[in-house]
């Protein structure tokens, strides 16, 4: 089972998740309380995983119609849902796992986490906003730009 399927398996009993061939070009996914989560049928596997995480973020964190992103409150709710998605499928532990497996390039990390590069970059931007340039986590120093991970014991502090 791939990561997209695992995420579907975790949530399908709580919210309907449908791949829809009729979605307009340019709309990757949408969550509504009536239809659940609709995903555009023209996505790649990694796009499905990335978009589903954000749409589940909407399910978990927002209510009501927030389509009009010129409304500041709606924009804030969109950001909250995206951040929820980042934390759901790209945890600091996942970045450390990549490091431990010698998965170091953006392409390799995205392939391993089954996400698109834009999702990873936006996630790292969010983590930089949350933690700053780097963060000590568990037994590691995670440098967020450019992404690099080091064991604390290997650092000359």
State where each predicted segment sits.
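Active-site hotspot residues in diverse enzymes, especially metal/ion-binding acidic/histidine motifs
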Residues: 1-51, 56-157
């Amino acid at each position: 089972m791939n990561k997209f399927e695992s995420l579907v398996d975790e949530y399908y009993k709580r919210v309907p998740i449908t791949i829809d061939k009729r979605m307009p070009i340019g709309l990757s996914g949408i969550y509504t309380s009536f239809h659940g989560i609709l995903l555009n049928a023209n996505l790649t596997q990694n796009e499905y995983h990335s978009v589903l995480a954000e749409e589940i973020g909407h399910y978990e964190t927002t209510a009501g119609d927030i389509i009009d992103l010129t409304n500041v409150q709606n924009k804030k709710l969109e950001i909250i849902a995206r951040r929820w998605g980042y934390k759901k499928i790209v945890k600091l532990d996942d970045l450390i796992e990549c490091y431990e497996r010698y998965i170091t390039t953006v392409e390799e990390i995205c392939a391993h986490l089954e996400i698109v590069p834009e999702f990873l970059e936006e996630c790292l931007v969010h983590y930089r906003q949350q933690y700053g340039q780097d963060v000590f986590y568990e037994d590691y120093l995670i440098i967020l730009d450019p992404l690099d991970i080091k064991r604390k014991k290997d650092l000359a502090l």
